[in-house]
Amino acid sequence: MFEKIQHIGYLTPDLDRAIAWFEESFNAVKAGGGPLNPGYAMPSGGRNAYVRFGNAEAELLEPVDQTGLSSEFLTMHHVGYVVADINKTIDELTARGFKFAADKPNVNVLGHQLLYFDSRTTNGVKMHITQLPDAAAEPNDGLEIERIIHAGYRVKSLEEAIKWYVDNFKGSLLGGGPSRSGGRNAFVNFSQVQVELIEPGDPASMGDDHVMDHVGYVVGDIPSCIGQCESHGLKFVSDTPNTNGVGQQVLYFETDTSMGSRMHLTRLPD
């Protein structure tokens, strides 16, 4: 059903600055964008832009109502999943009990058909399904990102979150264990995508059951990417990657250099 993660969406109070950051840091190319009418994604309306780097994409959204947004941060907003046939997928997901924010998909400026889930049926977090146009976008010369491996979420109950993905998206638990932040984590694969679920050391401190936490970008070789990233002003939390509970090598960016948003490079096991 889900073929890949098309993009992570971010809220920003300054769209031009956010575009410039991706251009400078990841050699990204602006693929399109424009004004957005008030709607489910941004109730106040605003404007957006899509940036591409390697085989990855990000959607940047600048709302009219910027209450609670920091001028220094990218705030994770949603994840978009690619499906082959959006109408067939809507029928299948509706049969599983999911609801959507509109009766039918809309078409964005890039020609993508997309439809948001009603977040009341997705643990309060925003997700949408996307059908790409027949003419696939070519990868650009940005940072050599192969794909987005997962979106990460902080959750109040790891067991309940795992069960939700297994039951609703026919997921399978890949593995997990103690997290470096002092809690526990788990990786769940569903279709051809993955999610990382992180239960903090003090789950009661969370206000919501699910909160978007980070994105993981797959690269062919982390050490060779470090120098490329550092030449663009990015820094990392360590000199070398660590290996997580499912055999992935992971290295996080310092959030001081990634506009306050948590991102990491990932080298998948052979």
Residue ranges and their predicted role:
Residues 1-19, 76-83, 130-162, 212-217, ...:
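N-terminal beta-strand motif that seeds the catalytic metal site of vicinal oxygen chelate
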Residues 2-9, 16, 20-49, 58-62:
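An N-terminus-focused feature that recognizes amino-terminal "leader" regions
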Residues 8, 29, 33, 79-82, ...:
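Tandem-repeat architecture and repeat-register "anchor" residues
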Residues 14-30, 87-97, 157-173, 223-233:
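Amphipathic alpha-helical segments
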Residues 17, 35-38, 160, 177-184:
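Short glycine/proline-centered loop/turn elements that form peptide/ligand docking sites
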Residues 52-54, 182, 189-191, 256:
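Short strand-coil-strand connectors
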Residues 59-63, 80, 84, 92, ...:
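A structural feature that tracks compact, well-ordered secondary-structure segments
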Residues 90-144, 177, 186-187, 227-270:
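Vicinal oxygen chelate
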